[in-house]
């Protein structure tokens, strides 16, 4: 099936302040599944961070909690890569794109995000490492 016919989640690159870029993951129906926490100086830097996120997705630790507005939100963290004692805590790499009224809705959004990452990873492999976004 040609890539143009595949329907699945898409990673979108978004312009940010100071000529930086960020990313968001959207479902095939356009619903936001999650967004990157930080911005990047270039699309190449962003692509490298996304590749690392896809490769390391099994190590992601997702936390669910309530925001100040009493909505449920999630954050995905990657562990710090260091053997030094006290090297720091896990690094936040993605977050929910919106707040949810119920905890179970938020947890389902985490699962949808992780499934979307898996899809993007499969597309990356199918494309031979070329950016599918």
Label for each model-derived stretch:
Residues 1-18, 22, 35-71, 79-85, ...:
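Short N-terminal "domain-start" leader segments
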Residues 97-133:
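Mixed-charge, glycine-accented linear interaction segment located at domain edges/termini
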Residues 33, 50-53, 93, 113:
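A compositionally biased, intrinsically disordered/low-complexity signal enriched
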Residues 31-43, 85-104:
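A short, exposed loop/beta-hairpin motif centered on an aromatic-Gly-Thr core
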Residues 17, 28-29:
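Short, ordered coil/turn segments that flank beta-strands lining enzyme active or ligand-binding pockets
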